[in-house]
Amino acid sequence: MSAFDNATLMITGGTGSFGSTVLKHFLESDLKEIRIFSRDEKKQDDMRHELQAKHPDTAKKVKFYIGDVRNPQSIRDAMPGVDYIFHAAALKQVPSCEFFPMQAVQTNIIGTDNVLHAAIDAGVKRVVCLSTDKAAYPINAMGISKAMMEHVIYANARVAAERGGTTICCTRYGNVMCSRGSVIPLFIDQIKAGNPITITDPNMTRFLMNLDEAVDLVLFAFQHANPGDLFIQKSDASTIGDLAKAVQQLFGDTGTNIIGTRHGEKLFETLMTREERLRSQDMGHYFRVAADNRDLNYDKFVVKGEVHTMADESYTSHNTERLDVEGTVKKILTTEYVQNALKGIPNG
């Protein structure tokens, strides 16, 4: 028997790429109800019509709640009867957050705190929150807000565990291919328009994972988490230059135009810091970074003289397995978006 049988799952930011993929995964499950919580009524209406057209028998288990994680009351109103939450609501565009950093604070930090407080008060059993590799050694506003979000998660997880209630954990992603606002759809659109691909820096490296892998990571965290745990998938990486060549190999070569890095971009991303590797556990396809459950009484650690040796290096898109162009082609072909684009099927 699955933990999801006859349960109610709420997905914040549920009309986004991740929420749509989770919905497909669970539509035929024995979940009693799936609650889509988001602030965009148009996307909710589009999703509702698509469900009714394609899945008329199971669409009735999906309920829509208009609200904003910034508004605590709207979250509390959607919370009664919820067993589990996947918290995906976020501002995630790096350049936009650079220009409007307080908006990232309001959604990514305060919004997450609102969700977790409401979940704890409502007796939700388990919450899995979604973070990003940009939270590790952050240099931009989005990454800083997500790093603070992670610490909000750990603090709330500690409080909830002390009360013996909600289990709260976190997942950290690399680049989720073909999610909204990501670069592969932009490359495809540029090629179809006959324009050159715009590349920031061909030597940049990024982790690559598809949306199904993103859902699998959340489900693994759901099944294995202790309070405050962080879960990371072992991921392949590619240079932006090779990623562009892979897309051109599939859709045609219209040339490239190197435009330079955008606001707040890194040469490479970090999924797990040296400091986190100290507390990490290799779980096969994933790493678990256990919560740091020390309290503020540091004297006992000094008196006992506990010493931990730091890991040699972080886990980054520069030192993970690097895909060549052919490997990158195979990787991006695992996405439904690219498969549809090759067939001429419009992507929503």
Q: Over which residues does each language-model region extend?
A:
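Strand-loop microenvironment adjacent to phosphate/nucleotide-handling motifs in alpha/beta enzyme folds
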Residues: V115, A155-G348
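Conserved Rossmann-fold NAD(P)-dependent oxidoreductase catalytic core, especially the SDR/UDP-sugar
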Residues: H87, L91-A147, A155
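Conserved Rossmann-fold cofactor-binding substructure of NAD(P)-dependent oxidoreductases
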Residues: K63-Y84
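Hydrophobic/aromatic anchor residues within beta-strands of the central parallel beta-sheet
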Residues: F64, A104, I168-T171
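N-terminal Rossmann NAD(P)H-binding glycine-rich loop of SDR-like oxidoreductase domains
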Residues: A7-S29
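Conserved residues in the N-terminal Rossmann fold of short-chain dehydrogenase/reductase
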Residues: S38, Y65-I66, Q106, D201, ...
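Rossmann-fold scaffold of SDR-type NAD(P)-dependent oxidoreductases
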Residues: T12, M79-A88, C129
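Conserved glycine-rich Rossmann-like NAD(P)H-binding loop of the short-chain dehydrogenase/reductase
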Residues: D30-D46
